[in-house]
UniProtKB/Swiss-Prot annotation:
This is tRNA pseudouridine synthase A. The lineage of its organism: Bacteria, Pseudomonadati, Campylobacterota, Epsilonproteobacteria, Campylobacterales. Keywords: Isomerase, tRNA processing. It comes from Helicobacter pylori (strain J99 / ATCC 700824) (Campylobacter pylori J99). One of its GO terms (biological process) is tRNA pseudouridine synthesis. The gene is truA. Coiled coil: none annotated.
Amino acid sequence: MRCFKAIVAYDGAYFLGYAKQPNKLGVQDKIESALNALGIKSGVIAAGRTDKGVHANNQALSFHAPKHWNAAKLFHYLAPKLAPHIVLKKLEEKNFHARFDAQKRAYRYLLTKNLKTPFLAPYIACGDYGSLDALNIALKQFIGKHDFSMFKKEGGATTNPNRIIFNALAYKTFIMGHECVVFKIIGDAFLRSSVRLIIQACVQYSLEKITLAEIQAQIHNLKATIRTPIMANGLYLHRVYY
């Protein structure tokens, strides 16, 4: 058997998350079904599991295939079976583990105050976010190593809640005629819905609905003020570093 590394982009609006689902509507279901149709019976490991509605620009995967498959041949046959909602961007033979070998994961979140067309609703979140300066003040609180037990949703199998945030910032840009705030968060790994809970906390602080002290208390596991993640549709797994 040969081990392959794949880089894929997918539209999270068409799936119930990355992981397998009972109704077969997970990204993993689609990819494994496509491989199965080619006679490749392999589980697919991802660098990170995205929630329902969350997109990926460069999700990294690892899987095995029989030795008669090479990267060029497999790309030729696999890519059409994944389209249109999953795009196979790169495929190479590489002995690695997509999850355990990953060093950093980078996420982006797109948020606009005024969405001018419903056709972008699955891809850009819409809502007030206050001031850019306040967002960056809040984001700085998360940089470093922390126990993120109070910044995760229930259901994850992780036993170690400690994670490192290397960089967290927000900046403004224009995307398809919309002024957006882009949140950029890079960490070694993230707990379930942690990125969306972090962004929600920053937005609520910027809107003066919570204080910086309340964010710090939640980071230190003293009291959870933010329990509901921000909407999923603006979030993208942007890049995985190895």
